[in-house]
């Protein structure tokens, strides 16, 4: 019997449409002969399943189910493709944990901590990891250009503490760019980070875990040429 998988997409941030594209990609990759797939689109309290005929079926949030042809359909697994809240910040993970539905990504603690850039850096700093100097601004809190210049210096990055895909992020290279960059970042989140620029090679190391083993990918360097191309396409 085929397992029924929910590809969860959408969310409540500027990354909404990026997430929908990710979901379509995942949907195209998974073998339909082995699994029954549905894209579940979420936006606020509007949760619905995209049906093959183009119709939409509302999701019962009490047990993450929907009705198709008079029959209740439940999910065996949730593949979370939401970029931003509630898919990357631990909220959906907690919801699925309570319903005992397995899902594709890390748990509540790791998701909520790593989604908050400032909090994650402070956590790592406690273990002796060297991080860039930064300031945290909350709820529209102001800071003078002089304070930024003195405490952080230029160039620097001003960005939402929560979120991704470079939305609201500005590389500041001149004093007159500071306040517009802060305003731009606050349009995306209620907490903004002013962070010193670090010049060097950026590396990353991905991994995934199955019920049988953990797989670690090779260490790779981030290509800024590819990043700039991605940001141009995205925005």
Cite the ranges covered by each PLM segment.
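Active-site nucleotide/adenylate-binding loops and adjacent lid/helix of ATP-dependent enzymes
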Residues: 3-9, 13, 21, 113-201
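Single conserved hydrophobic/aromatic residue that forms the stacking wall/gate
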Residues: 226-229, 233-235
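Short, well-ordered secondary-structure micro-motifs
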Residues: 49-51, 206-207, 228
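Glycine-rich beta-alpha junction loops
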Residues: 44, 141, 162-164, 198-202, ...
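Short, hinge-like loop/turn segments at secondary-structure boundaries
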Residues: 54-57, 122-124, 151-152, 210-212
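Short hydrophobic/aromatic-enriched beta-strand-loop microsegments
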Residues: 102-106, 131, 215-216
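Short, solvent-exposed loop/turn segments that connect beta-strands within catalytic domains
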Residues: 71, 211-215
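ATP-binding N-terminal substructure of ATP-dependent carboxylate-amine bond-forming enzymes
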Residues: 1-104, 108-109, 113-115, 119, ...
């Amino acid at each position: 019997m085929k397992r029924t998988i929910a590809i969860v997409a959408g969310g409540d941030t500027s990354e909404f449409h990026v997430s929908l594209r990710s979901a379509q990609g995942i949907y195209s990759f998974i073998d339909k002969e082995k699994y029954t797939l549905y894209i579940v689109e979420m936006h606020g309290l509007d949760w619905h399943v995209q049906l093959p005929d183009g119709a939409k079926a509302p999701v019962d949030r009490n047990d993450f189910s929907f009705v198709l042809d008079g029959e209740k359909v439940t999910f065996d697994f949730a593949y979370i493709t939401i970029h931003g809240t509630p898919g990357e910040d631990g909220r959906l993970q907690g919801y699925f944990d309570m319903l005992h539905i397995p899902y594709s990504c890390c748990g509540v603690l790791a998701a909520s901590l790593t989604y908050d850039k400032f909090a994650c850096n402070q956590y790592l700093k406690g273990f002796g990891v060297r991080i860039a100097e930064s300031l945290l601004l909350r709820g529209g809190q102001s800071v003078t250009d002089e304070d930024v210049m003195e405490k952080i210096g230029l160039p620097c990055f001003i960005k939402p503490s929560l979120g991704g895909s470079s939305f609201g992020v500005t590389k500041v290279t001149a004093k007159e760019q500071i306040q517009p960059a802060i305003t731009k970042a606050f349009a995306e989140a209620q907490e903004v980070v002013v962070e010193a620029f670090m010049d060097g090679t950026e590396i990353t190391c991905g991994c995934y875990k199955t019920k049988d083993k953990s797989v670690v990918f090779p260490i790779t360097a981030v290509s800024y040429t590819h990043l700039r191309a991605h940001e141009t396409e995205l925005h």
